[in-house]
């Protein structure tokens, strides 16, 4: 098993990132700036993992064991050395071993998390269709409050990719997102998300609703 492990720099954060999703990281600690420079020099990505205990700043945090490997999309370095780093989630991994001594930042020996194959059945089609309709209605309802008409919500055709994209912008606790990330059954993930989407749709009808983050969904929408 050890022969199949991949060495990966790890970035523990108070957030859960899914495959296919993008996030902008504000990097200011020396150890993580060094990590980003290392990744750029050797054209490699790193892993984002949710913090189980500890904090983002200071001593090394204790992370959950399942995270998402990301590739660096762009880096902006400021005069004071701080960085804005845009990354794209690509695949999940599970940490088998961790090393917090050889580098200033945490390094993991990781293996892939394998998703179960999705069976092409009427139930699958129905769940995927319901998810698409709910997401379309949810986003359109939210943006209509700002007099913005959405021509189209562009979501992945693949059921697994769809489940990850939707899970990323759900407004739920990190521990719930971590559970969805660790789930290896696409239909189970979608089934668990549908009642959450239903609740989001009800909340979105309220005037004070502001929970949807436009930055998380803007790459999937086409304004009129």
Question: Each PLM stretch: what is its role?
Answer:
Residues 1-224:
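N-terminal low-complexity, acidic/polar interaction/targeting segments
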